[in-house]
A protein has these predicted regions:
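Active-site glycine- and acidic-residue-rich loops that bind
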Residues: 537
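N-terminal localization/anchoring segments of enzymes in phospholipid and broader phosphate metabolism
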Residues: 1-527, 545-549, 561-585, 589-675
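Hydrophobic alpha/beta core scaffold segments
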Residues: 552-556
Length: 675
C-alpha cells in the first residue's frame, strides 16, 4: 500500500473545497461569486507553477517521482482527469448564481440579448473606451501570429474579404487593465469581449466576420535563477521577470467558436515563435472549452462593486487589543508579552509600532524582514521616513513568488532612502516574519521584537488568519539579532538559536524530537498540528509511528496533506481536518501535550524545513500558550466549515445540526472576550 497521497491531487482537493463554498446557499450571492473568483485564480497559479513544472520534468525526462510514486506523465493525466468534471461543476454553479443575481437586479447579460438602446450604448462605449486599446492583427504572409504573454485574453476570428472573398484569420488582443464588466445601465453588465466581438467589422474594414471565439493562454511562469552566477541579485531578478511572460503554454481555455476555428487556433499556436525564437511546445497542454465566460477571477470587479453591499456579508471591524496604549505601544509591550490573532484582533498595532519607532528620537535601529508587503505599504513608508534619521536594515525577499516585482520596487525605494537592504540569502528563501526595534533609554539598550506567522501587509491581515507576537524579552531579541547577523553574513544555513528555533538547521529536528517525546507517553500523548500544508515524508513517517504507539493526533491542514489518516495498523489514531471559510487559514500552531505549544512561519514541507529561513517560537507565557490552544480547540469543534479527510483521500463536511459552530464567526464574536 502506498503510504502517501499525491501532492498535486491533494491541492486540487483543497481547491474543490473552495468551490464548495461557492455552492453554499447560506452565503450571500456575491460571497459565493467571490469563491468562484478565488477558485479560478488559484487554478491559474497551479497551472503556471505546478503543472508547468511537471511538464518541464516530463519533457526533460527527469526521473524523479511524486511522493506517492507517480511519474510526471501520470500526474499530468490525473490532474486533467480530476479537473474534467470539476470544470463543468464550476460552470453550472456560475450559471446558478448568475440566474439568482438576475433576480436581485445584477444582470450579466449576453450582448445578443440587449435591446437597440442598450446596443447603442455599447457601441458608444466601444468607440470611446475600447477601440484605442484593443490590438487587432490580421494574420497573413506578412503578419504572423504574435507572441502571447502569460494570461493573454484574446479573440480569434475567421474573416472574409468582401471584395475578393478571400478567407483569412484575425487575432484581437484585449489588454488586462480594461474593465471586464461594462455597466451599460444600473445593474446591467455586458462583457467587454462581447462588445468588441460585436464591433469587429469596425476593426477589419471591408471584411465579414464568419466565426469568432474567445481564448486565454496560461504559460509557465516560474522563474529559474542560477544563484551561483548572481553578482547583482536585484538586476538578475529584474531580467528574469522580463522572461516570465515568455514561458511555454500549459493551458488553453476557449469559449464559443466552431471546432474548425479551434483547430486553426491550435495550429497557429504551434507555429508561432516567442521573442527568443523557440517554438511553443503544446505537447501535454491542457485544453478546455467553456460554456461560460473565461477567467472567473475577473468576478472580483462585481464582488467589489459599491452598489451591491446587500449581496455581501457585512464587513467585520477588527478589535484593538486593550493592552495596547495608543500613545506608547512600547510601554505596553514592556509590561507583558502579547499575542494578537488576526484578523479578529487588529493589525494596526503592528503598523503603529513601526511608525512610532520611526518618529521616536530614542530609537536607534529597526531591523525587519519583508516577504509580501503589497503595492501600497504604510510600513515601508514608515521605514523610508526612518532611514534618514536612524539605522534601518531590511531583508527584502526578492524570491517571493508573484511579488518579485513589487518587492524589487520597495527594495530600491528603501535603498534610495538610505536603508541597508539585503536582497535575500544565497540558495535560501527568507520566509520568517520578524522585526526588532532597538531603543536607548536611561542609558540602556532596550529591544522590542515582533514575530508573526503572516506577512507585514495590512490588507492581507484583514483576510488571512495569523498570529503575531510582541515581546521586550532580551533572550528573544538576542536570537533575532543573531539571526539578522547570520543573514547579513550569509551563514544562515548552519546557524542555530538559543530560545527560538530556525530553519533550515533546527525546526525539523525539533518537531521530530517533540513527536518522539509524545510517543514516550503512548496513549496519554496528544499532538495537534495546524498548518497550511503537510508534505514532508519524514515528519509524516514519525506521525505514523506516534499513531502506532497510541498517541492521539489531530491535524488541521488547510491545503495539501500527503498523510493518509485512519489506515488500520498505520494511522488509526490520526484525524485530518481542513477549515475553509471567508478568511484564509494561515497561522501555523503546533501543540504537544507533554511539552509546549509553538507558532511558526513554517509549513510542514521540505521547502520550508530545508530550503528556507523560518522561525519556530515556543509560547513560554502561560496566557499566550492558553490562547493558542484555545484557537485549536475551537477549530476542532467547528461543525460548519470543517472537513475531515478519510483514508481514500476524500473530504467530507463535519456537521452537527444540534451544535452548529462556525469557528471563524465564533472568533469574530468573541474577539477580545475570550482572548
Amino acid at each position: 500500500m502506498n503510504r502517501f497521497f499525491n501532492r498535486e491531487l491533494s491541492w486540487l482537493a483543497f481547491n474543490t473545497r473552495v468551490l464548495n463554498e461557492a455552492k453554499d446557499e447560506s452565503l450571500p450571492l456575491l460571497e459565493r461569486l467571490k469563491f468562484l473568483a478565488i477558485y479560478d485564480t488559484n487554478l491559474d497559479e497551479f497551472y503556471m507553477i505546478r503543472v508547468a513544472g511537471l511538464k518541464q520534468l516530463y519533457e526533460h525526462k527527469i526521473a524523479s517521482k511524486g511522493i506517492d510514486g507517480a511519474s510526471h506523465e501520470e500526474q499530468l493525466e490525473k490532474i486533467k482527469h480530476y479537473l474534467a468534471h470539476e470544470i463543468e461543476e464550476r460552470e453550472l454553479e456560475f450559471q446558478k448564481i448568475q440566474a439568482l443575481l438576475f433576480k436581485k437586479g445584477l444582470c450579466i447579460t449576453p450582448y445578443n440579448e440587449l435591446n437597440l438602446e442598450q446596443k447603442a450604448k455599447a457601441k458608444t462605449y466601444f468607440k470611446e473606451q475600447l477601440y484605442a486599446l484593443v490590438l487587432p492583427f490580421k494574420l497573413d504572409s506578412s503578419h504572423t501570429f504574435p507572441p502571447l504573454a502569460n494570461l493573454t485574453f484574446a479573440l480569434f476570428a475567421r474573416i472574409k474579404d468582401k471584395e475578393t472573398q478571400t478567407i483569412s484569420y484575425a487575432l484581437i488582443k484585449l489588454p488586462s487593465f480594461i474593465f471586464r464588466f461594462v455597466e451599460l445601465e444600473k445593474g446591467l453588465f455586458v462583457l467587454a469581449e462581447e462588445i468588441v466581438e460585436a464591433h469587429l467589422e469596425e476593426l477589419f474594414l471591408e471584411h465579414e466576420i464568419l466565426d469568432c471565439m474567445a481564448f486565454r493562454v496560461t504559460c509557465d511562469a516560474d522563474i529559474a535563477i542560477t544563484e551561483d552566477e548572481a553578482h547583482d541579485y536585484a538586476d538578475l531578478m529584474s531580467k528574469s521577470l522580463r522572461k516570465r511572460n515568455q514561458g511555454e503554454i500549459v493551458r488553453l481555455q476557449t469559449q464559443k467558436g466552431s471546432q474548425e476555428l479551434l483547430k486553426t487556433l491550435l495550429a497557429s499556436l504551434r507555429s508561432f515563435q516567442t521573442h527568443s525564437h523557440k517554438k511553443h511546445k503544446l505537447t501535454g497542454m491542457h485544453a478546455y472549452k467553456s460554456t461560460i465566460m473565461l477567467n472567473l477571477g475577473d468576478l472580483w470587479e462585481l464582488v467589489n462593486h459599491s452598489d451591491f453591499k446587500a449581496l455581501k456579508s457585512p464587513n467585520f471591524t477588527p478589535k484593538i487589543h486593550p493592552h495596547f496604549n495608543e500613545n506608547d505601544l512600547f510601554k505596553s509591550i514592556e509590561k507583558q508579552d502579547l499575542l494578537l490573532f488576526h484578523p479578529y484582533e487588529s493589525f494596526e498595532p503592528v503598523v503603529d509600532l513601526i511608525e512610532q519607532a520611526a518618529s521616536d528620537p530614542t530609537t536607534l535601529s529597526i531591523k525587519m524582514t519583508l516577504y509580501r508587503v503589497g503595492k501600497h505599504s504604510p510600513i515601508v513608508k514608515a521605514l523610508i521616513e526612518a532611514a534618514s534619521k536612524i539605522q534601518v536594515s531590511v531583508l527584502v525577499e526578492l524570491k517571493a513568488r508573484f511579488d518579485e516585482e513589487s518587492n524589487l520596487h520597495w527594495a530600491k525605494a528603501l535603498e534610495r532612502a538610505g536603508a541597508l537592504v539585503v536582497h535575500g540569502v544565497f540558495k535560501l528563501k527568507v520566509h520568517a516574519k520578524m522585526l526588532v526595534i532597538t531603543k536607548k533609554t536611561d542609558n540602556q539598550l532596550r529591544h522590542f521584537t515582533h514575530l508573526s506567522t503572516g506577512n507585514y501587509n495590512p490588507l492581507s491581515a484583514k483576510i488571512y488568519t495569523d498570529v503575531s507576537f510582541f515581546s521586550a524579552k532580551n533572550e528573544i531579541a538576542n536570537d533575532i539579532i543573531k539571526l539578522f547577523h547570520s543573514l547579513l553574513t550569509s551563514s544562515a544555513t548552519n546557524s542555530t538559536l538559543e530560545t527560538l528555533f530556525m530553519a533550515p538547521k533546527q525546526i525539523k529536528p525539533k518537531i521530530i524530537e517533540l513527536i518522539q517525546n509524545e510517543m514516550n507517553h503512548q496513549q496519554e500523548g496528544y499532538i495537534i498540528l495546524k498548518a497550511n500544508a503537510l508534505v514532508d515524508s519524514e515528519i509524516i513517517e514519525w506521525l505514523y509511528q506516534a499513531s502506532q504507539k497510541g498517541v492521539k493526533i489531530d491535524l488541521i491542514i488547510r491545503g495539501i496533506c500527503c498523510l493518509k489518516p485512519q489506515v488500520k495498523g498505520l494511522s488509526e489514531n490520526i484525524r485530518v481536518y481542513s477549515i475553509v471559510g471567508k478568511y484564509l487559514e494561515h497561522a501555523r500552531i503546533y501543540y504537544f501535550k507533554h511539552e509546549n505549544i509553538y507558532f511558526s512561519s513554517a509549513d510542514l514541507m521540505p521547502r520550508n524545513l530545508e530550503r528556507r529561513v523560518e522561525l519556530l517560537v515556543p509560547a513560554t507565557n502561560p496566557k499566550i500558550a492558553n490562547k493558542l490552544l484555545r484557537i485549536l480547540e475551537i477549530q476542532l469543534k467547528d461543525t460548519l466549515k470543517r472537513y475531515e479527510l478519510n483514508s481514500k483521500g476524500r473530504y467530507a463536511k463535519v456537521s452537527n445540526p444540534n451544535d452548529p459552530l462556525n469557528s471563524q464567526d465564533y472568533f469574530e464574536k468573541q474577539a477580545l472576550k475570550t482572548f
